[in-house]
Amino acid sequence: MSVVYKGQVIDSELSKNSFGGTEMMRERLIKNVDPKWLEKCAIHFSRPRQLFEDVINVLYCHDLAEDPENNILANGGWKKFDHIVFVSAWQRDQYITRFDIPYSHTTVIYNAVETQYEPVTKDVETIRFIYHTIPHRGLELLVPIFDTLAKHYPNIHLDVFSSFGIYGWEQRDEPFKQLFKRIEDHPNMTYHGHQPNDVVLEALKKSHIFLYPNVWKETSCIAMIEAIKNQVICIHPNYGALTETAANATIVYEYNEDPATHANYAFSIAAQVLKVQQENPNYFNRFTYSDRYNLARNNIDSFTNVWNQVLSLLVQNAESKKEDIIYQHSDN
């Protein structure tokens, strides 16, 4: 979708108006990774359009392996890249199985967020739910689930930050307009559309539960990482890379393909959490005061260190090969 070539961004038509998770990682890469390594590389953020002969080519995959854009990797096409970086081990294994890529040609670098886990005692008079990812990943299940929960627990509220507008694709919101209207008309729900990330982060500070009946396989989930770091209880299925992303800091239930069964699972667990909170007002704060919420591997320092290690090794290997070629020519 875009490429960081010698430290400079080259956008595509798809990426130029987008500020989703991929673009966040691109910004953090440029901001934090040593420029002397970036200067010698082209880092392709999925869907590469052009390879460069004068630098090292690294493919930075954020998409699912089955995305048709990845057919470039088939039949040994992965060899066009000097290295491939993935955002989760689950995602990496999907690509390796599909395209027969050697493990040694890959690295997993977990997505990083700038938020630090700094636990505070949150006000629990109103239990605030939040949904802060794009609509097709589970909002259609969440709204009726929450509507039923609100009939039993009137002190809950749902804030929805959700729109394809974050990618510059407002037209893709059209199938969800009635759902958005249902949210707007509900006294216990608020629809915020798409907002800058700093606005969402402020909302997360006041939120208690990220109920995420996910129906779209994700290779990682930045929304969940940011929620955990902001001391939010996350409830979700064991689908795609969500369990790996969660790193034992969430409440996980079995994924089910049937929407009604899936919704029942999510509802039951959320209702149980609310019941326990109602009986024990200290439950939420006790649950979220835990070192498991720190997610150290998703810190900027960890992200930066691994990128520096990977790129420095690639550069050193490339320079060593050049020296060997020069030496061989001199012998001849």
What function would you assign to each model-found segment?
Residues M1-L51:
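N-terminal pre-catalytic "stem/leader" segment of glycosyltransferase-like enzymes
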Residues K205-T219:
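Acidic donor-binding loop of glycosyltransferase active sites
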